[in-house]
Amino acid sequence: MGGTRRQLLTSPQSEQSFIVTNILFSKLNGNDIESLEKLLKEMSDSRFTIPDFPPEHSKRETLRLGNYFLPQVFNKTGLTSKVPPSNVHDLLNHLEFHCGTLYYADLVIEAMFRSGRNIKKNKSYLDFGSSSGRVVRVLKAAYPESNWFGCDPITEAIEWAKENLPGINFYNSSQIPPLPYNDNQFAMVFAISIWSHFSEKAAITWFKEINRIIEPTGLLIFSTHGLNSLQYYYQNDGKPETEVQKAGETLLETGFCYEDVFKPGHYGLDLSDWGNCYILPEWILGNLLCDWKLLLYQVGRADLNQDVYVLEKK
């Protein structure tokens, strides 16, 4: 890529990056883990092995495999290995089985922790753009005494989640506000790769609506594409250099770049304001600080691709 380059960094992970994984793993004992290891050894299938290193990833794989092969033992974690059928939206459908995404559940709680907050009993939390519940199902297992909600405009995903993930309040929301929630209802709202798809108009509209439903000093945690994502797609997904250059120039000039990328019929959605977008922190600072305070900005924190932000409602 020609032109000016920015130094693109990724945020280092630490013990704070695995809070949810450690909470769920701590519900197991040595006998539970030995039972799983014995079963996997008897199966002699190289697809189903627990890595020795690093230990945090070993814990995640233990939870995933255990909830699938020994649910009668591992159900004490609160996780379930139920997965949507292939015709239902699920961003983990590349896996043969799963129990939700521990990675993104950890990411959300790490962002809260780094912002000086924790999940509290009896408080309400919303997964905005939950799809079939891949993140919120894990957080519900880790923090069962809190109130968990999920909303998404993809009808089939929400219907599946309602039927298969009890204890979480799912709602099939519209692509335009308002949401069916009260003012100041939530202590925290999180949105994984939702503000990576809005047009600029829709992005601002939804920031205002989410601000309405968050309590004063409550948090919005979200991931979105930034400059780091352009480099990621260029290096890993074969995004043409000319497209990257054009998007990068627009992004550096205006702080926001939107691209139409989806074909008609994409999960029945209205695509007029739904594509791919890239946002710089300068745009966040220039457009949102009347209603929000920026607490955290992590470059490339989500899968070495998307940036993670934490905003506090004023």
Descriptions of predicted regions:
Residues 5-6:
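Basic polycationic patches enriched in arginine
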Residues 11-121, 131-178, 200-205, 221-314:
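Class I (Rossmann-like) S-adenosyl-L-methionine-dependent methyltransferase catalytic domain
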Residues 124, 147, 185-187:
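Structural signature of beta-strand start/N-cap positions in the alpha/beta core
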Residues 179-189:
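A short acidic, Gly/Pro-enriched loop at the edge of an enzyme's catalytic core
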Residues 127:
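Class I SAM-dependent methyltransferase core
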Residues 204-216:
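A short glycine-rich, Lys/Arg-flanked "PGG" loop and its adjoining helix->strand segment in the class I
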Residues 187-201:
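A short SAM/SAH-binding and catalytic strip from SAM-dependent methyltransferases
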